[in-house]
Amino acid sequence: MTTKRIIACLDVKDGNVVKGVNFLNLQLKGDPVSLASLYEEEGADEIVFLDITATIEARKALYNVIKDTASVLSIPLTVGGGIRTPDDVSMALRSGADKVSINTAAVESSQIVKKSAEEFGSQAVVVAIDVKKVSGNWIVFTKSGTYNTRLDAIKWAKKVEELGAGEILLTSIDRDGTRLGYDLELTRKIVDSVNIPVIASGGAGKMEHFYEVFSLAKADAALAAGIFHDGIIKIKDLKSYLSQKGIEVRM
């Protein structure tokens, strides 16, 4: 069995970490540098830093905050938000990111995925896919969950793999912040459709949810935010629990 990864997510707005429900009603949770450092100490395998309003505010990512966050980490850092061109990808990598997450721009011009993978390697390119169920179908939404692209999520996942993405960050908007568990059906369908790693995101509320998304949905990694920010689950305890349940994790 491959080693499963636990990823702590920092949703950043105006330089502060925030968290909401279904991408709405954001509350302040702390500053990214100290939280990133804390989660590494607790045993997180990676940190994802998402500048959640960069795209809808039509501005560049917060490169100074990214630089400060990267400077305290020795685990991989993925950065997303406001990434529109291969130059933005380059800037994020130069600021200290190990991987760059592309979301809205990938839908608007899929060549950014292809060009970035060719220039920086697939291992540096993550495509974030935010999904809502609409009339029984899984549909891709962009612009922080505000815009219905009418793209089928499974077809889009296959397409980004073809374009050279090295990983998919899959978020269920319906489950985001609800703490009701990951969308296992959606995650499994995407995992079965591609040959690149899939990070499950949206809905983690208790340790069992991580076990389910690894054992039933076969996700390669599980991302969470609110339950870590609020101290409901400590990453160290989560990894001990998963290890006892037969899931291979880095201790």
Swiss-Prot record:
HAMAP family: HisF. It is found in: Cytoplasm. Heterodimer of HisH and HisF. This is Imidazole glycerol phosphate synthase subunit HisF. The keyword Ubl conjugation does not apply. Belongs to the HisA/HisF family. CDD domains: HisF. SUPFAM superfamilies: Ribulose-phoshate binding barrel. InterPro entries: Aldolase_TIM, His_biosynth, HisF, IGPS_HisA/HisF, RibuloseP-bd_barrel. GO terms for molecular function: imidazoleglycerol-phosphate synthase activity; lyase activity. Keywords: Amino-acid biosynthesis, Cytoplasm, Histidine biosynthesis, Lyase. One of its GO terms (cellular component) is cytoplasm. Pfam families: His_biosynth. The active site is at D11, D130. It catalyses: 5-[(5-phospho-1-deoxy-D-ribulos-1-ylimino)methylamino]-1-(5-phospho-beta-D-ribosyl)imidazole-4-carboxamide + L-glutamine = D-erythro-1-(imidazol-4-yl)glycerol 3-phosphate + 5-amino-1-(5-phospho-beta-D-ribosyl)imidazole-4-carboxamide + L-glutamate + H(+). IGPS catalyzes the conversion of PRFAR and glutamine to IGP, AICAR and glutamate. The HisF subunit catalyzes the cyclization activity that produces IGP and AICAR from PRFAR using the ammonia provided by the HisH subunit. It comes from the Archaea. Its main location: cytoplasm. Coiled coil: none annotated. Its EC number is 4.3.2.10. The keyword NAD does not apply.
